Design a protein with these regions (language model features):
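Flavin (FAD/FMN)-binding glycine-rich loop and adjacent Rossmann-like elements that form
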Residues: 1-199
Length: 199
């Protein structure tokens, strides 16, 4: 989910402990923070972009954040019930993460205090308990046709004469899998590459 929160006390609903909350889901975040020692949430914990009216657009930031890595594999080909369960699991994870950051005593105090400034906005998504109803599904299908666009197109090493569209954003893929390799946790799939013009 891309998250809209607010730090306006008059418009804020506190982030509360979600039903079925399990702090062990966030053990890796604690391990990461112990090593990385972020100075603030925007320091590779949450990507907090300020919006008008004391609100945010929050996105994934760092190796353990709002992306529920690896839990979406069955979404593209899943039936409605499978997709519904995946979305419910993602919602549970996301709300649990926000609560964990603000309330778990093992989190550094400065990050807990910063998180507690934020809450769900009373005036947003009033028909969905003030939480965005739209999951942040970046991509689930790739069209395979007579021509398949690749990194070579993005970096202008290969062009086509009969283009039907244009893109102007970086190559930006979030992690899609979490593995244990030689006793160490590894995320796989993150691509952040820019520095080129529209393609």
């Amino acid at each position: 989910y891309r998250l809209c929160l607010t730090n306006d006390p008059a418009n804020k609903i506190d982030i509360t402990r979600p039903a079925g909350y399990d702090s062990s889901m966030f053990e890796l975040l604690l391990r990461y923070i112990a090593v990385f020692k972020p100075k603030e949430l925007n320091d590779r914990v949450l990507k907090i972009d300020n919006m008008p009216n004391h609100k945010t657009d929050i996105n994934n930031n760092g190796p353990f954040s709002t992306d529920y890595i690896g839990m979406n594999w069955n979404y593209p080909d899943g039936d409605y019930n499978t997709r519904k369960q995946i979305l419910a699991d993602q919602l549970h994870y996301t709300k649990g993460l926000l609560y964990f950051i603000g309330h778990d005593p093992r989190m550094p105090e400065h990050l807990r205090k910063e998180m507690l400034q934020w809450g769900y906005p009373k005036d947003e998504y009033t028909d969905n308990n003030n939480f965005t109803p739209q999951a942040y599904i970046r991509e689930s299908r790739r069209m395979i046709g007579a021509y398949v666009m690749t990194q070579n197109n993005c970096e202008a090493r290969e062009t086509v004469a009969d283009a039907v569209g244009m893109a102007a954003y970086t190559m930006d893929s979030h992690n899609c899998e979490r593995l244990v390799v030689n006793g160490m946790v590894k995320n796989e799939g993150d691509v952040q590459k820019g520095g080129f013009g529209p393609y």
